[in-house]
Amino acid sequence: MKNVIIVCGLNGAGKSTLGKVLAEKLNYRFIDMEDIYFPKDDPNYMYSNPRPFEEVERILLNIISENDSFVLASVKGTFNKEIVSHFKCAVYIETQKETRIKRVYERSYNKFGERILEGGDLYEKEKAFFDFVKSKDENTVEVWLSSISCPIIRVDGTLPIGNNAELIAEKLGNQF
């Protein structure tokens, strides 16, 4: 039996950060969808060449076949039925829009520095991404969550990561 826990939430919610801590706590592998979508084939900008969705699904199915238990960080899990059937639990990180936008900007600045500022070589690309994050429908994850049948654990994305990981592990212990 596969134990795939999807940690979902909008950009900047804290999926990767919480997912890594949770995976370590549960002794599961951690997978970040960002790493699957964006191959590291451009050393100057890691988001240059996104993979087609069908290829992403193939890679994810291979990961599922090779691993019994892992935590998957993804905005939402709108994948084919075969993939979704392996989700044993969804963790939804609820985080206010202002906090998320601030985190996204800080993360980009920490990765790319002044290259994201006006006049920098990544300014246009990052500005387009920031605009995308700001315009994203706040209910998009909620709508997806209503379509799945596995248990959903909701956590506050502004609480300490360790506290959220402990809460999730406790709830998972009661469910599995």
Cite the ranges covered by each PLM segment:
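Hydrophobic anchor at the beta1->P-loop junction of P-loop NTPases
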Residues: V7
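Small-molecule kinase domains that catalyze NTP-dependent phosphoryl transfer to phosphate-bearing small molecules
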Residues: G113-N164
